[in-house]
């Protein structure tokens, strides 16, 4: 056996022997008992550490049924209930809710009273905020210093209070959400208007109570010579309730209090003639009158606050949104961060840059809008997605007689008015008693002066002051106070001038006493005094409203509501580039003018279609594959005369690459009496009720079924009693009744409208409602204006009659019925546009060759599009005598030939 194995055997044997305590050790009974108890205790502790199932736990408790060692039995549920109620009432009464009389919470009241006791009025120098906070903490407010300083900071912020009660010196925070500097760095004093809050507090106008340790006295309420609850507003969260009262304009609230004082029966509607709406320190715009009326009548309601912004148009076609005022209690940095987040997440598009240019003069947030974006839409989106527009919810709860109460507007004003009646009466009573005491002394001094020799004799013979006072009282029937005043009087008061002043003072004091008694004995005079004093406060501190009231604004508006209705020109290129230009940018030119460039042409891209529309109208976009899409006029990006435009796929993402837009029509109203006429290149016509196209969306639908070798070429909205004119490239126009075409479903194929040869195609469609004349224009710039009656009526699917000499005018590019007074915009392939008036074109016969309408730039240039500027009030022009002779002669010849 190896040495290692021997060692293992010895170790094993020793362990076995060690486990058998009785074999090697002998304990006496006492020691053994101690070890057994310790071992049992350790086993119990080990068992407690072992986790057990819930069922294994047994909670042992001992109920205390009688008083033991100073402990009294109590029901836990009752103790919890009473303790919570005490805590809740403490929060409600002593911390979170304001008193309806002065509009202050205890901490604000203690700050103002403490500062007034320190003499820190607006005329005194500023003192360290830490000194003020320490004084308030030590004497009145046994809570944390942060709560006192935060309340003090808020009262100094001109963006938190409409009329700040603290005049702060140093960093007291900002509207960006920056915190105030530590109280060891800032200084403060009472603002001028805060002095009005404590005015008269030394005249027993309010009740005082002991402070928390009984060493000081503090007021239960401040005199408050203006209605601070509504003027400054307040907010706070108590237990089971909260308050939220907005600030108001001082002048409006004082006028309402005066109106209530004059007419206690005035209604809330009557009071709202004075109190127009809240007036926030940050300005902004207020709307939602229904919510305001509800708030003033019930104490609960909501209004909407919206930032003030204006749109600035720039010379390069871009624009800026400039925000100058933001809603109440909204941090400017929060708005900036939200805008940045939405731009990053692409919830807001069309903004190229934004920045904060705010300074001491006020808020200025500048948002740069991209060239093709609509600033009104972007601004509305910002209102929806950021706190540039937010609601203020009224919850006008305040303490009335120490109990929380929901107040309406009249009740708020009534509580304050009752408080002022009490304060004013107590002040007058105090002044009356003070003047009575002064008059009493002056009357004693007057008796002294009238009997000066006798008084001096009595005083000289008296051994002490007390003896002199007693003899004076006995001799002249004076009171102790009068006698003491005589004894204490200096000899200088006996001069003639001093005696005269004393008599004048007595007269003045007696006059004031009479006035005080008259006011105190008459409720009407007391009310007049209160109104007078309130008006003095208004004149001293009143100012204009900061928040604008707009009851005509909806709280939730569509983007389109922000876009002005304007007449626009929509241009479409052959490569599906589209843009809109204000109609006003096209100036009228005389016939034969060269025109102005309206689009920068690119290789293989020419102007195809021109539509005069409205920003609030529907644009039905038809493609050659007979698909139809719908967009609004303002959704087409704005461009300049020289800009290329925007690919239409950016506006209608579902449009296919192989689709080519062939027609855009403007629809303002989907009337059931109207029909939509579609005409294909091969002369197929279809009539469908216009209502079937009302629900078309951007994803598109089919307008009709096409043959394989056919494409949609033109679309027209018509009434049932109209005549239709289909013009073909072979210079023929087919005139027939709309009623000849039966109404079909949206996806039907249609019937023949005009008979064509293989090389010909339809170029345009018009109707008799458009006027009594037909204007025809060829690709070479020649055209003419003729009477509709010059074109004989045929039938559907006929060849039609000739309108232009093709050799001279070229292929027909446009032929439509007109009144003869409209303006036309003519587009050339080279991108030139000219605006002409049909008034400048003489009416000639159908068989005439035509006149030069536009001078083209080079032989390769030709006319590709014509748009008529519609005038709803337009009527057919009257023929001149010469025109009448010519056209009627031709009509007679045509009739004779038939």
UniProtKB/Swiss-Prot annotation:
Pfam entry (one): DNA_gyraseA_C
Q: Where is region (Disordered) located?
A: 1-22, 36-56
Cellular compartments annotated: Cytoplasm
Catalyses:
ATP-dependent breakage, passage and rejoining of double-stranded DNA
Q: Which residues form the Topo IIA-type catalytic domain?
A: 97-562
A GO molecular function held by the record? DNA binding
Q: Where is the motif GyrA-box annotated in this sequence?
A: 589-595
Q: Does the keyword tRNA-binding apply?
A: no
Q: Does the keyword Signal apply?
A: no
The catalytic site is made up of 185 (o-(5'-phospho-dna)-tyrosine intermediate)
> Assembly and partners?
Heterotetramer, composed of two GyrA and two GyrB chains. In the heterotetramer, GyrA contains the active site tyrosine that forms a transient covalent intermediate with DNA, while GyrB binds cofactors and catalyzes ATP hydrolysis.
Query: Other remarks?
Result: Few gyrases are as efficient as E.coli at forming negative supercoils. Not all organisms have 2 type II topoisomerases; in organisms with a single type II topoisomerase this enzyme also has to decatenate newly replicated chromosomes.
Write out the function statement from the record. Answer: A type II topoisomerase that negatively supercoils closed circular double-stranded (ds) DNA in an ATP-dependent manner to modulate DNA topology and maintain chromosomes in an underwound state. Negative supercoiling favors strand separation, and DNA replication, transcription, recombination and repair, all of which involve strand separation. Also able to catalyze the interconversion of other topological isomers of dsDNA rings, including catenanes and knotted rings. Type II topoisomerases break and join 2 DNA strands simultaneously in an ATP-dependent manner.
Q: Which family does it belong to?
A: Belongs to the type II topoisomerase GyrA/ParC subunit family.
- Name of the protein in its database record: DNA gyrase subunit A
Source organism of the structure: Metamycoplasma arthritidis (strain 158L3-1)
Q: What is the lineage of its organism?
A: Bacteria, Bacillati, Mycoplasmatota, Mycoplasmoidales, Metamycoplasmataceae
The gene for this chain is gyrA
